[in-house]
Amino acid sequence: MEWGSVALLGFSAINTINILRQSQLSLTERLIWIFYTIFFVIFIAEEISWGERLHGYGIDSIKAINTQGETNLHNIGAFQLKGLLHLGWAALGLLLGLGSWIIKDSPLLPDKKLSLYFLIPAIWYISFEFCRDGGSCPITVANHQEIYEFLIAIGLFLHTRLWRHRKTILNHSKTI
């Protein structure tokens, strides 16, 4: 499932690059899509442990404090133990899932019809943290986290796909 997320994020990055090639973008739109492109590249690099899974080389000092012994930042023990990673995922899910209900038609925020791709993971991460803090959690993060990361990746791919399609249609109608 993790490689599926990586593939969707890769396609999302390709979509953002194609959106950036459109000449009619405002400066604000261009900055938003540059931000998304950088976000996708970092997200992909973190998911594949900055290539360690592909070439086998890692940074020992990071691997030593990493809960999975990998070269990535998101599995560093301090982030995992304090719930910071989960709360970050929850905040991202809430922002992307609810943002378009407040700010309409912004390339920064996915369309309302994509809300559940972000809100379901946000609710799960928040619930997991409350459950874990209470000490009576029947679920484990390892068994479920990839599913929710995958949902977010699907939502981000669909968001970039919709905007890419929208910009292509706008360009085509202006040339007719």
What is the role of each PLM region?
Residues 39-46, 120-133:
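Aromatic-anchored segments of alpha-helical transmembrane domains
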Residues 101-104, 127-140:
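Juxtamembrane "helix-exit" motif on the non-cytosolic side of transmembrane helices
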Residues 41-61:
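Transmembrane alpha-helix/helix-exit interface in multi-pass inner-membrane proteins
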Residues 19-31, 102-112:
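Membrane-interface helix-boundary motifs at transmembrane edges
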